Amino acid sequence: MYCRDSDHLKEECGVFGIFGTEEASVLTTLGLHSLQHRGQEGAGIVSFDGNNFHSVRKQGLVGDNFNNQNILSLLPGKTAIGHVRYSTTGESKPENLQPLFANLALGGFACAHNGNLTNTHSIKKKLVESGSIFQTSSDTEIILQLVARSHKKKLIDKLIDTLNQIKGAYSLVILTNKKLIGVRDPFGIRPLVLGDKDGSPVLASETCALDMIGAKYIRDVENGEIVIITEKGIESIKPFKNIPERPCIFERIYFASPDSIVGNKTVYTYRKSLGFELAKENNISADVVVPIPDSGVSAALGFSQKSSIPFELGIIRSHYVGRTFIEPSQTIRQFGVKLKHSVNRSCIEDKRVILIDDSIVRGTTASKIVKMVYEAGAKEVHLGISCPPIKHPDFYGIDTPNYNELIASKSNIEEMTELVGAKSLFFLSLDGTYKAMGYNERNKELPQFTDHCFTGEYPIDISEILKINSYNASR
């Protein structure tokens, strides 16, 4: 299984769905492959052939589990949805893989969810007390349970009834006997786009999935919107009170694929601009700019262009290190970062180096890389981060550590600099981050993005999660 280092945020999940094509499951597999960066723990596909639903869910990468020629026989039908998972709630177990499926009174109902619900404990408690039995520890099952228990007569009304009870960040792709449905939460925290593949509507977390299958981008699913796709066409309803969209800023900073388009620009362009703004704010004398791969490459290019300091690939990242090499023995574990990163000495030796990365979470990986660069003969090592310090955990679908594990939550800049071992450590300001996103400044009254990891301003109530976390910590 693919393993991200502990000094970066973990991706959430990716969703995909397509309606009305004989190759639905094949195209869904390809779409999920392009969204693999959003989750590597497992993948699943549910298809519908007009009579029956078919489901395959497996732990591991998409290419390892859905690469055989029998996929159309395993997952027949003209409509399919899929999901790649990185667990933010629920353990990494096969039963927690999505899409989740249930046979309801009105027919089959499969759901793939990207995000995280914030009031699951209270809802689950009520459901269990009223007789519900849960088969998973995923918050997505709560959606199925609420839809099943709704007293509304029509399926869409049952879904709206459910959405009015849950709180949190969610982009949903739902498959029923006759419909493919896309849903985005009222703030639009998690992404969802609508496309078209030769007349077949497509839903996906990112435009890179549309590009993979040769589909045309139509538009983003709007915040608070339900898109209903049937043989009659595409219908849009907005059951919620209209509020301004506040997408997660980390989609542009880190999570989304560099080639995905958000707000009419590629994600690569935003990340390059982050590096450009970082250089504008920090005048550091150095001989070379080196990205910490792969996440720091775009920002390092922008930093290099603005500062006129040469860009070099001074650190090489191995793409072939899995959990097998990380976990089994202390002898192998102690090599840690060296298994994933190696230093190109010719770019480093006798030079003043500026390392660039997109974020720093715990600081453990950063400190080891700084040490490696010094050991390769660097005169000075400076570390630049192309976003503000991450001081607060996320509860909306990103797997972040708690406050005690976030280096910026418990340490000031001077302390962090000493901990990572660099000559200097500098971050992009919040205003600089917004400038890179195309805004003159952050709207303090109504921020354009969900940026709580930097500011601690959570747009959706998290009191229930904090209460549960506090209780668990005291046990």
Question: Each predicted region: which residue ranges?
Answer:
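Conserved short alpha-helical segments that host acidic/polar catalytic motifs at enzyme active sites
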Residues: 1-223, 228-286, 292, 380
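Flexible loop/turn segments at secondary-structure boundaries
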Residues: 23-25, 88-89, 119, 189-190, ...
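A conserved beta-strand->alpha-helix junction
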Residues: 66, 136, 141, 311-322, ...
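Generic beta-strand/beta-sheet core signal
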Residues: 112, 175, 183-184, 195, ...
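Amphipathic alpha-helical
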Residues: 142-153, 293, 305-323
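Phosphate/diphosphate-binding loops
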Residues: 161, 209, 216-217, 221-225, ...
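PRPP-dependent phosphoribosyltransferase catalytic core
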Residues: 163, 178-179, 196, 214-220, ...
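Short, glycine/charge-rich flexible loops or terminal/linker lids adjacent to PRPP-binding catalytic cores
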Residues: 308-353, 364, 391-397
